[in-house]
Amino acid sequence: MTKKNAAPIPLILDLVDKLLEARFFTKLDIRWGYNNVRIHPDDIEKTAFKTPLGLFESLVMTFRLCNAPATFQTFMDTQFANIIATGHVVIYLDDILIFAETIRELTQLTHQVLQRIQDLDLFLRPAKCSFNQTSVEYLGLIISEGKICMDPIKLKAIQEWPLPQMVKDIQKFLGFCNFYHQFVKDYSHIAQPLFNLTKKGNPWNWTTKCNMAFETLRQTMIMSPVLMLLDHEKPFTLITDASDYATGMIIEQKDALG
């Protein structure tokens, strides 16, 4: 029986919140991901699988294992702990983001990370790495100085999204929207008719309200709203709202434009 690894995977927005004063970015992608972690010798025989060519065993951690994400995240957090502690490096599984206020500082940090990668005998995927950028795509978000946007490549999918015909279509659409929900004001309220369709036992009934919810979410995301990163030195305004089936809260700050 597998013992679940309870180590948490970082929340994407928690990582993004650390980027307030960053002006320059370098993104690195670790090649082969989970396969970089060796299986303990005592456990290798437990990985055996049968093929037409014979019986094989895995020497490295494979994908689709329930503990693979937590194990790999723990590995990365441990091996890069002192570099992460600088406050200028965040790691989400095999995606590393280095950020700084100056190119000089960014270059120094990048050298430290690359040296650690070399020491660990890890490799990068050059096609997915970018260096010394003022704007970078990271975990489905476009990050630049003081603000985050939705990835336009992913938004192209929402522009062409067909009208849902069954529950699975709704679940797929909501899965996409949930990832970007923080960009949509009153998201839970708007999406409620669609969530109702996914409840077990509810019949498929595509109503005018469902169609309006679908189009409102689609059009709001097509407009590609921008979120500003929180400045902890400025006052916060907390705005809350509630209905019979949803609660909402946003934190606002005034910028130079009010």
Enumerate the language-model features and the residues they cover.
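Retroelement reverse transcriptase polymerase core
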Residues: 1-258
